[in-house]
Design a protein with these regions (language model features):
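N-terminal hydrophobic/helix-forming segments and targeting peptides
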Residues: 1-257
Length: 257
């Protein structure tokens, strides 16, 4: 029973981590919280590091990668675990809007990673990532998660798509998300979410994500299903393994990038 409870708690932590990590930037932020809560010391790349034996440290780069390591009491080799912070998805291109037939707007996206395209149809989607904005105190980067059902990639009725079963999907044609009507303004949306004026958005790096939450299922609750299991299950597991490791003779490294 104790082992079952431990497994259940770990599963719940994993699914909460994935739900809170709709983009690689959010995933790295959440991993940093896990590390800091466990007493790991944050290091900055532009500072001189003074390391002590027996302590654990971490540093980040670009907001999309995090490297954690422990300094052994007696060095006897190293052990490394690594994973990706990103997941297969659609990335919004710089020319973000496509007007179709003068009546509605689609997002101009491109495939990112090894995607199973058919799974993206007819489900609520939203956007997450980061924006670089201009503020009174200078230029800064802000994380964004538009936490609502924002867009969808619709499939057409069967009588409008004869032969579709044999059709090879083209992400640049068949899988452009429907954003809104003719008045939809992507740049205004990003500015609103970032809390700045439209002209103060310098750039943005946004990705689509499915709105469904992860679930436990099966006759004995033996399975889990969730968006972004590739590769956040590994990113979470790598971090947990690093934090729970007790080997004091190895240089332990967890690299999530």
């Amino acid at each position: 029973m104790t082992e079952m409870l431990k497994t259940s708690e770990t599963t719940e932590k994993l699914l909460k981590f994935i739900d809170a990590s709709p983009s690689c930037f959010h995933a790295v932020k959440n991993i940093c919280v896990m590390l800091e809560d466990a007493g790991c010391i944050r290091l900055l790349e532009n500072e001189t590091w003074t390391l002590e034996k027996g302590k654990r440290y971490f540093t980040t780069r670009n907001g999309s990668s995090v490297l954690a390591f422990s300094v052994p009491e007696n060095y006897n080799g190293m052990q490394i675990v690594s994973a990706h912070s990103d997941s297969p998805t659609f990335r919004v291109k710089s020319g973000a809007e496509i007007t179709v037939e003068g009546h509605y707007k689609k997002l101009n996206t491109e495939g990112y990673g090894g995607m199973i395209l058919s799974t993206w149809f007819d489900r609520p989607l939203s956007l997450a990532g980061r924006a670089v904005v201009r503020t009174e105190s200078g230029v800064k980067s802000v994380l964004l998660n538009i936490d609502r059902d924002l867009c969808i990639i619709p499939s057409l009725a069967i009588h409008m798509t004869r032969g579709m079963a044999d059709h090879k999907l083209n992400p640049q044609v068949d899988l452009l998300p429907l954003l809104g009507g003719e008045n939809a303004d992507y740049n205004a949306l990003i500015a609103e979410e970032a809390g700045v004026k439209k002209e103060d958005v310098i750039s943005s790096d946004m990705f689509l994500y499915p709105r469904q939450h992860g679930v436990v299922f099966g006759m004995e609750n033996e399975f889990i299903a969730s968006p972004r299991l590739d590769d956040l299950q590994c990113a979470f597991s790598a971090t947990e393994a690093f934090l729970n490791a007790e080997n004091k003779e190895k240089l332990l490294i967890s690299a999530v990038f």
